[in-house]
């Protein structure tokens, strides 16, 4: 997607935890975490819909644990900050409706095996991982900085620095590239829900000074960088009252901001037996280690599975033309170093833990938290040996 030569612009967006789709994602992952904490072998596929005054949870679950769904939903909404009916969503009064079934036995028989190493993939499909040398965490610059802005937008709201802000918000960053390298930011877009009776000038000044200038390093923004803030002129009605939210509708901001491919599968509410999630995490882990090892400045990994089959049906590791090493050499090295059967992915990355609430907002990739094992660069030496460099 991104050209390698010439001058061009590339844009990525991020959303805050109060965005309705992210509210849904957080509820789904909260249910998952509650069950994994009690039963690490829980099988969870939890979807959430949120709208004015209501949260609806549906899905298929097999577990020895128990989740008090109304309590999980309300505590999640409370932590986000929807605490008043004036916002159209209040953790104390919102309705919680659920329809949870058992995991299909037809699916279970394809995943469960007498020998754990033979665990089959939970579905067919392809997953992608990506890494590049544009930022310290080996993420594309546009999505990296869009997430930084979203995190700061939430921080100034929760810390009371800009006490007129409300939970819903979005950010967007456009970078100018020259010959494949990010040079500077051409424009920034920030939209934030706010209290009524606050002037646009107050909102604009506060966001520029407390969010943008305290997030983006001096010199990163072009001299003529345009800043767009709440460009409709009013953003009082937001969150689930302004838009219905659904699990799995922010898959691009969850990953690489459009800089890499996406297989289409969402992450939130799914345990690691679902290769939509574990396969994508493994893809990121591989791509990041390839770049960190110096095998390529840019790397994309595709892994594809057949439901009920342990071994992937295809694996491709590509430098997208950025490396002196061929894609064939990179792919062979990766296959030598990494076991891509679901059981071994889950074991290597320790994915049967209640860690997913931390992944939900501001990107599943590019945040080097202790729980995010897929962000570790601990396979560098093995990859260099396998690639014979």
Swiss-Prot record:
Tell me a GO biological process for this protein: one-carbon metabolic process
Could you say which residues bind ATP here? 19, 168-170, 234-235, 243, 249-250, 266, 270
Please give the cofactor(s) recorded in the UniProt entry for this protein.
Mg(2+); K(+)
The entry marks the following residues as binding L-methionine, namely 60, 103, 243, 274
EC supergroup of this enzyme: transferase
Q: Where in the cell is it found?
A: Cytoplasm
Molecular-function annotations in GO: ATP binding; magnesium ion binding; methionine adenosyltransferase activity
Pathway given for this chain reads: Amino-acid biosynthesis; S-adenosyl-L-methionine biosynthesis; S-adenosyl-L-methionine from L-methionine: step 1/1
Main subcellular location: cytoplasm
Q: Which UniProt keywords apply?
A: ATP-binding, Cytoplasm, Magnesium, Metal-binding, Nucleotide-binding, One-carbon metabolism, Potassium, Transferase
Q: Which catalysed reactions does the entry list for this protein?
A: L-methionine + ATP + H2O = S-adenosyl-L-methionine + phosphate + diphosphate
Its GO CC terms? cytoplasm
As to how many cofactors bind and how, the note says: Binds 2 divalent ions per subunit.
Highest taxon of the lineage: Bacteria
Q: Where is this region: Flexible loop?
A: 103-113
**InterPro entries attached here?**
ADOMET_SYNTHASE_CS, S-AdoMet_synt_C, S-AdoMet_synt_central, S-AdoMet_synt_N, S-AdoMet_synthetase, S-AdoMet_synthetase_sfam
Q: Which Gene3D superfamilies match?
A: 3.30.300.10
For Mg(2+), which residues are the binding ones?
21
Binding-site positions, K(+): 47
Which HAMAP family did the record assign? S_AdoMet_synth1 (MF_00086)
Subunit note: Homotetramer; dimer of dimers.
**Function, in words:** Catalyzes the formation of S-adenosylmethionine (AdoMet) from methionine and ATP. The overall synthetic reaction is composed of two sequential steps, AdoMet formation and the subsequent tripolyphosphate hydrolysis which occurs prior to release of AdoMet from the enzyme.
UniProt lists the family membership as follows: Belongs to the AdoMet synthase family.
Task: Tell me the protein's name.
Answer: S-adenosylmethionine synthase
Q: Which gene encodes it?
A: metK
């Amino acid at each position: 997607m991104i050209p390698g030569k010439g001058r061009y612009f590339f844009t990525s967006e991020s959303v805050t935890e109060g965005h309705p789709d992210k509210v849904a994602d957080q509820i789904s992952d909260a249910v998952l975490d509650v069950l994994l904490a009690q039963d690490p072998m829980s099988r969870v596929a939890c979807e959430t819909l949120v709208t004015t005054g209501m949260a609806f949870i549906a899905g298929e679950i097999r577990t020895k644990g128990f989740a008090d769904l109304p309590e999980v939903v309300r505590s999640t909404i409370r932590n986000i900050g929807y605490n008043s009916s004036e916002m159209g969503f209040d953790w104390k009064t919102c309705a919680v409706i659920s329809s949870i079934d058992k995991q299909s036995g037809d699916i279970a028989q394809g995943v469960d095996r007498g020998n754990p190493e033979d665990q089959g993939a939970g579905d067919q499909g392809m997953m992608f991982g990506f890494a590049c040398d544009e930022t310290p965490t080996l993420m594309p610059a546009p999505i990296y900085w869009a997430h930084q802005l979203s995190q700061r937008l939430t921080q100034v709201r929760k810390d009371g620095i800009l006490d007129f802000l409300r939970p819903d918000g979005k950010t967007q960053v456009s970078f100018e590239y020259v010959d494949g390298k990010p040079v500077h930011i051409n424009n920034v877009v920030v939209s934030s829900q706010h209290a009524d009776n606050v002037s646009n000038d107050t909102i604009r000044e506060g966001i520029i000074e407390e969010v943008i200038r305290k997030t983006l390093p001096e010199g990163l923004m072009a001299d003529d960088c345009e800043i767009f803030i709440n460009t409709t002129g009013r953003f009082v009605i937001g969150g689930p009252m302004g838009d219905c939210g659904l699990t799995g509708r922010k898959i691009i901001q969850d990953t690489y901001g459009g800089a890499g491919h996406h297989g289409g599968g969402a992450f939130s509410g799914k345990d690691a037996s679902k290769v939509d999630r574990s396969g994508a995490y493994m893809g990121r882990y591989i791509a990041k280690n390839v770049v960190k090892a110096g095998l390529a400045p840019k790397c994309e990994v595709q892994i594809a599975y057949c439901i009920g089959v342990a071994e992937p049906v295809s694996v491709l590791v590509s430098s997208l033309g950025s490396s002196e090493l061929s894609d064939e050499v990179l792919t062979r090295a990766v296959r030598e170093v990494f076991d891509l059967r679901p059981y071994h992915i889950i074991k290597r990355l320790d994915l049967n833990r209640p860690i997913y609430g931390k992944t939900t907002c501001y990107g599943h990739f590019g945040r080097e938290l202790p729980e995010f094992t897929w962000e570790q660069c601990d396979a560098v030496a093995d990859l260099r040996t396998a690639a014979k460099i």
